[in-house]
Amino acid sequence: TELHPDFKNLKNLEYLDISSNCFQTIPDILTPENFPNLHALELNANQRHTIYDLSNDIRENVGGFIDEPKFPERILKWNNLDTLGLSVNYLQGELPKMLDHEKWTAEEVHACDTLPEILIGLPKVLPETEFFAINFNRLTGELPEWLLYHPKLDLWYPYSLVFQQEGKTRDGQNTGFSNEPASLDYYYQHYPKKKYNPNNRTEE
């Protein structure tokens, strides 16, 4: 399954939902260059079959981006997205650390009294994204620092929509993140203005 090349002519497209299409990989045409005005990208539930243990199944063409060799780093470089949904797929491997990506600068952090010092020097990944969902994939390894201290992490309902994985990978690993925090107490130590804000939003 692939998107037609003419999709790239939709330069003014702002919202794209291609969930439930059984893609084996994320279509190459999906780039910020092809969709400069896109702010919401939904790629959820592309599984053709529901397979809990990928190491114990020989079916082909099962969808769920199962042929992606690793987590699609290029999607994480799409800075204009405010919504990114990748839930209920077969993405495997670790979340990339994005060490070569643009970093938060001291000037940016000091210009906003709601941003903590710990951000300085961390990769500035998906800075505008208020909805980020990668739950029910087959991800493993460590959660990267750019995610653990992301300014909008609390808006992402991380224990439901980010940290929660399921099943086993193709090589038989149990899924889940080795450094999943027990709570967000560490986070609110760096974002004290958020903890008692009922909407979990930083003050403008």
Where are these regions (language model features)?
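The feature encodes a structural signal of leucine-rich repeats
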Residues: 3-6, 26-31, 51-55, 68-73, ...
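Leucine-rich repeat
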Residues: 9-12, 32-38, 57, 77-80, ...
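Conserved hydrophobic beta-strand positions in leucine-rich repeat
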Residues: 13-18, 38-43, 60-61, 82-86, ...
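Consensus "Asn ladder" position of solenoid repeat domains
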Residues: 21, 46, 64, 89, ...
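Acidic/polar low-complexity surface segments
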Residues: 45-66, 101-112, 117
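Exposed regions on extracellular, virion, or secretory-pathway luminal proteins
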Residues: 68-71, 102-124, 167-180, 192
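Leucine-rich solenoid repeat scaffolds
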Residues: 126-203
